[in-house]
């Protein structure tokens, strides 16, 4: 044991927490490293593809043991299974008998004192625990609210599916939270929302905020800068994110089609770079619009962030704390974000970042920054200072030992 009274830890997460290069993996990776400071950690997780599986060695270097299962469940089949079993589709999509068996074996064979489940779809792998073992449920975001938002005003079968998922998933989340010793969310706003819909107390539902790797995401760090050809000569606006994720897709579509024409009226050479892996066909099609570039996966996002005149985060549906916003601010870049993308981040609007209520205002605020270099520089400097002051991972995860120890 590394800490008095704490045995070993079982950590369950829906994607292998390596490498920390997308939102869900960034949090799970840093949480895992914090848990490893407390006690030996056994990790059960899924791999989306061969690239995920290739990081098994890195995971093995820090875990006491591991179980990585390739995930190939069909969304259609998972949806049908969920309907048949009364499960949320999200849970059915990650169900696997091998993971259930492995969890039971680890609990029987090892002196596990705490089980940490990361994201709602891993909660169903946690059985009823023996007295004295703690169950910490890190929901991260209130996923049911996201599906409810998808379904609002949406007609046809897809609208029905999303509304049904929102209802069933919320019931599941509430049942899990009742069973867990404590449930955590990425921001106090998310935690407060869940307390309101579940009726649970602050002792049962708490905030566990995201952080940012300040040495890595730093304007002074060593990284490859964009070439002059990549950078171009005009104003560069950048969005970063996983580009097969619906909120990101909708965000860049809106900015490219509505905000960019207004910006290019004033700056005909302005470019909008959509930076992130797995762009869908709809995202790739945006590259046909004037001034829009779709990069796909890049080796190091910091080069694009450092080159950006403005980083934009025009999300309309957003839960919790957006890593993309923290990273841009840590790089000292001026950020224009929607209210949804900035919600939950402990900053002052107009001092640390600019916040827009619609696509037209996003364009206006970008143009304001492009016209006032001093304002842009001051905003970036204040953004970096706020990240250093408030969002170092060591500070945001400082309460984890108490959650594990009870």
Which residues are covered by each model-predicted region?
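Conserved acidic donor-binding segment of nucleotide-sugar-dependent glycosyltransferases
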Residues: 353-360, 368-374
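Acidic anion/phosphate-binding donor-loop and adjacent secondary structure
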Residues: 148-149, 195, 212-228
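Carbohydrate-associated surface elements
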Residues: 189, 208-211
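Nucleotide-activated donor-binding/catalytic signature segment of Leloir-type glycosyltransferases, i.e.
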Residues: 65, 267-303
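Short hydrophobic beta-strand element within catalytic cores of glycosyltransferases
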Residues: 324-327, 334-338
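Acidic donor-binding loop of glycosyltransferase active sites
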Residues: 181, 291, 306-320, 331-334
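A short, well-ordered alpha-helix in the C-terminal region of glycosyltransferases
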Residues: 375-389, 399
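Acceptor-binding helix/loop patch of EC 2.4 sugar-transfer enzymes
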Residues: 14, 73-93, 133-174, 192
């Amino acid at each position: 044991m590394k800490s008095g009274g704490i045995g070993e830890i079982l950590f369950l997460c829906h994607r292998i927490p390596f490498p920390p290069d997308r939102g869900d993996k960034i949090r799970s990776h840093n949480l895992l490293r914090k848990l490893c400071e407390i006690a030996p950690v056994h990790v059960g997780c899924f791999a989306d593809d061969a690239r995920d599986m290739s990081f098994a060695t890195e995971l093995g270097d820090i875990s006491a043991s591991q179980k990585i299962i390739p995930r190939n469940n069909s969304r259609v089949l998972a949806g049908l299974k969920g309907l048949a079993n009364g499960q949320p589709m999200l849970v059915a999509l990650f169900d696997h008998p091998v993971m259930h068996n492995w969890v039971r074996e680890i609990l029987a064979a090892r002196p596990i004192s705490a089980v940490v489940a990361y994201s709602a779809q891993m909660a169903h792998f946690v059985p009823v625990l023996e007295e004295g073992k703690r169950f910490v449920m890190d929901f991260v975001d209130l996923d049911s609210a996201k599906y409810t938002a998808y379904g609002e005003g949406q007609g046809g079968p897809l609208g029905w599916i999303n509304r049904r998922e929102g209802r069933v998933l919320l019931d599941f989340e509430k049942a899990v939270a009742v069973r867990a010793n404590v449930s955590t969310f990425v921001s106090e706003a998310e935690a407060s929302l869940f307390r309101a819909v579940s009726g649970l107390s602050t002792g049962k539902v708490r905030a566990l905020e995201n952080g940012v790797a300040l040495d890595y995401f730093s304007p002074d760090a060593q990284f490859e800068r964009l070439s002059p050809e990549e950078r171009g000569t005009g104003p560069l606006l950048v969005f970063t994110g996983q580009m097969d994720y619906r909120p990101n897709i909708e965000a860049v579509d809106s900015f490219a089609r509505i905000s960019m024409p207004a910006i290019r009226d004033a700056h005909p050479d302005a470019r909008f770079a959509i930076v992130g892996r797995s762009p869908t066909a709809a995202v790739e099609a945006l590259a046909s619009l004037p001034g829009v570039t779709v990069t796909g996966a890049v080796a190091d996002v910091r080069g694009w962030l450092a080159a950006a005149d403005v980083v934009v985060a025009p999300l309309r549906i957003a839960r919790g704390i957006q890593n993309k916003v923290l990273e841009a601010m840590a790089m000292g870049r001026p950020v224009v974000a929607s209210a949804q993308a900035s919600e939950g981040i402990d900053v002052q609007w107009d001092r640390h970042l600019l916040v827009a209520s619609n696509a037209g205002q996003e364009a206006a605020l970008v143009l304001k920054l492009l016209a006032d270099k001093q304002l842009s520089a001051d905003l970036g400097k204040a953004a970096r200072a706020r990240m250093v002051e408030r969002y170092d991972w060591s500070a945001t995860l400082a309460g984890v030992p108490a959650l594990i120890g009870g």
